[in-house]
Amino acid sequence: MKKIECIILDWAGTAVDYGCFAPVAAFIESFNEIGVPVTAAETRAYMGLTKIEEIRALFNIDRVKVAFREKFGRDYTDEDVQARYVAFQRVLFDTLENYSEPIPGVVDTVEALHKAGIKIGSTTGY
């Protein structure tokens, strides 16, 4: 039987911030900053897209399009998408520590893997 040499852990949204609350909060806040709110349900509907594509998708929600047009007197542009992406990143990294608690057992598991000489790789969506 072959020995396990390496495992890959998905951190954000799985081993840490189980449920992906950090990006949801960052999307909500980045849109609130311009007075065009989005909901948690709306942000969750597009999870799995890249963050910039999710922002585009949020801007394309009819209610959000109307709110943006009423607020700014025009349709959104790619510059608006880019600006919300920059805002999203800023908010995410400013608040990430609030969502950094590992799920129960992760720290002990990582320590046990290290002691067993098993390498750990990482992946994350944020």
List the predicted regions and their residue ranges.
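Conserved phosphate-coupling serine/threonine residues in phosphotransfer and NTP-handling enzymes
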Residues: 124-126
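N-terminal helical cap/lid subdomain that shapes the substrate entry/recognition surface
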Residues: 2-107, 114-119
